[in-house]
UniProtKB/Swiss-Prot annotation:
Activated by light-induced dephosphorylation. Inhibited by dark-induced phosphorylation. Both reactions are catalyzed by PDRP1. Homodimer. Its EC number is 2.7.9.1. Residues 538-878 are annotated as: C-terminal. This is Pyruvate, phosphate dikinase. The gene is ppdK. ATP binds at R96. It comes from the Bacteria. Mg(2+) binds at E749, D773. PROSITE patterns: PEP_ENZYMES_2, PEP_ENZYMES_PHOS_SITE. It is an enzyme of class 2 (transferase). Catalyzes the reversible phosphorylation of pyruvate and phosphate.
Amino acid sequence: MKKLIYYFGSNGSDGNASMKDILGNKGAGLAEMSNLKLPIPDGFTITTELCNYFYTHDNSFPKNFRNELRTAVEKLEATTGKVFGSTKNPLLLSVRSGSIVSMPGMMDTILNLGMNDEVCAALGEVCKDKRFALDSYKRFLEMYGATVLSIPSDLFEQIYERHKIQADIYRDSDVTPQLLEKIIEDFKKLHVKYAEKLITDPYEQLESAIKAVLNSWMSNRAVIYRKINNISESSGTAINIQSMVFGNLSKTSATGVIFTRSPSTGEKKLFGEFLINAQGEDIVSGTRTPLPIISDDSNSMKATMPKVFDELSKISETLEKHYLDMQDIEFTIENSKLYILQTRTAKRTAIAAIKIAVQMVEEKLISKEQALMRIDPESLNQLLHTRIDYSKGLTSIADGLPASPGAATGIIVFSPYDAEKLSHHHKVILVRHDTSPEDINGMHVSSGILTIRGGMTSHAAVVARGMGKPCVCGTNNLVIDEKKQTLIAGDLILKQDDIITIDGGTGKVFLGAVPLIQPTFSEESKLILEWADETSKLKIRTNAETVSDALVSVKFGAKGIGLCRSEHMFFDKNKIPLVREMIIAPDIDRRKLAVQKLLPLQTQDFKALFRVMGDKPVNIRLLDPPLHEFLPTTEEDKKNLASSLNLPLSMINQRLHAMHEVNPMLGHRGCRLGICSPEIYQMQVEAIFTAIFELHKEENIECKLELMIPLISNVNEIKKLKGDIYEMIHELEERYEHKFSFSLGTMIELPRAALNSKKIAEEVDYFSFGTNDLTQTTYGISRDDIASFLPYYLEERIFESDPFTTLDEEGVGELIEIAIKRGKSSNPSLKLGACGEHAGHPASIEFFHKMNLDYVSCSPYRIPIARIAAAQAKIKHG
């Protein structure tokens, strides 16, 4: 068995920052801080190897682990001068998880471990403070009971509140030692009820706490968090055991969290909060509203503890320069002595991540490439957050702390269960006293989070920022009535389903929906996206067929349109009746008449699109979906169609019945329509080239057209349609006395097309991989029906991910690779693109980069994400 325990502390460390895989993120940080000679409590890290052993050996420990653990504690006793379980100078321990990737609040922590009646009495004597010792004992029983014995936390809360009410006490600080003794006795009875005995042996407590932390790796909340954030389950967690230092020892003791820069905005200034006479869990849990470290407030740390503040400031600067990244630092002050408990790379909003990355390049701390690799592409969704339009003279109903930026409007829900249930049909705002890790699913589906308690570093704030969701915390002027399920704001009483709006950028809460402003990119955002474009090889295009989508795409930096689904233009209310006439018409003459009515409308559509895109390439896919999608379904629409064609309703119903297909997505669609009903493609080609000619003549715009034929499976299909298209273009060139320049391509979206790509490539200028249909036809799974079994497949690990979100590299990816290799063998100048939903997914973009595609085309609001992902792929793979 490999080494399981690594020491750290005032005498140096066995490990360092590079050992995250075995020490976890927290343990590696503690080891590195020891090597930097920073003031940290002595301790040791149990490696991730134990977690992996635990889960592969029926939740048991290795043979010699208990002896190693006892040796480690004895070494800790020697360095601290305290003894574990002693009734003279007791050593108390903290037991904390430490996964490789930070998972704030998702796993378990136990403080003050080693407590029993005798140790509590000894601690009171040593510290000359009986109340402090009793308070520490109470905290231990509550935390150990909830974490190790699975006693519901609210049972402890009920006991505590009952005793306070009976004693006519309202503030925690007024609870007397005598009352604490009564509370502790009731807590101990609760332990006996659930565990059949009170566990008083310190080593038994320690072993059971270690098992509890290991078990929390597979807790429901941790599993959900890993799924949401794509964190591997196989990495396991380390465990960090440290000698306790007490932030709740006196009025010169405190606990807090400090960020070396603002996690919300990225501003270069220290930002954080602390609580006097408190332990670390008090600030992280959000049960008390903390004080600022820096502010004009006389209660700030800078004002009340200036010497400690200066030391903390210097350590913060040291850690940021050492790690070359913004740090999230937890600390405790015990009788004016500062201890650093943890440092880690700080979670931050996308706005902050970009600002910090750019700042650090300007400060010559990191390179542009390093800056780009620091950005989570998916987090750029946050740049698209709306904000409230305050020019409308709005009045808020409450004010809190701006914990995570962005504005959200939704109905009030008071539980994560209701959030999950109602989010299918409504946008919801989750309203809680404070959030806990158990709320993770409800937070994930909510549009925004509002908490009554907690600060900028509470669980709600940290998790919301990581999710990119608006969050307001510490709204002390709001009251939740749990029994009546109402939210009280002064004289206003709100119930579930009432609508509110929260502003996570200002901390304000409004009644109802309020006017919102769409976001704009900061100068730093524009700059880092420019760096991305300079770095990447893949060009990023967009899927667009409307002027509004095209304008948004150009604004977000699209280099062209990679997929214009021409059929989407047909659904306009002015066109759909003509499309239906074209499809249902009983003879060719009537069909051609309907087509001619559509022609000028299609021409104007294409003209408007080309005008927006200017000299950027525009790839237009000719009509693809089955005709049934355009046909009327309501009786009213059927009657209107019968009237416009001057046909009896019975004949319309006969035609509709005759056109019914059992499996239309694999039926009469795509190129098959163009071959069987050539007048449709002829009309589209005429409209496209007429639009190009008119823009050239009237506005001197030179359009870059790419014309794409869908759903090819046989080279003869492309040959037939290619001949028809070129014949039509030749007629148009003669009519307009103008020579047209364009590229002809096809979508590779069927396995047979991929396998026969050598022949197909001889007939076209480019391939565009339609990964949606290619995935459907490779798997034999309908994208519309996969939801009925996908959750079970993911749970049973049959699928690692949704194949319609993350490209299947083994199956679909191999078909793409075959198509590229064979296509290039017959046409070396063949251009390559991809235009399915996968084209906006970072992992899939990395695959497309490795396949040497020329571009990917994604939805407009995925463009910034794709630009960063393409740059990262180039940095990783060259």
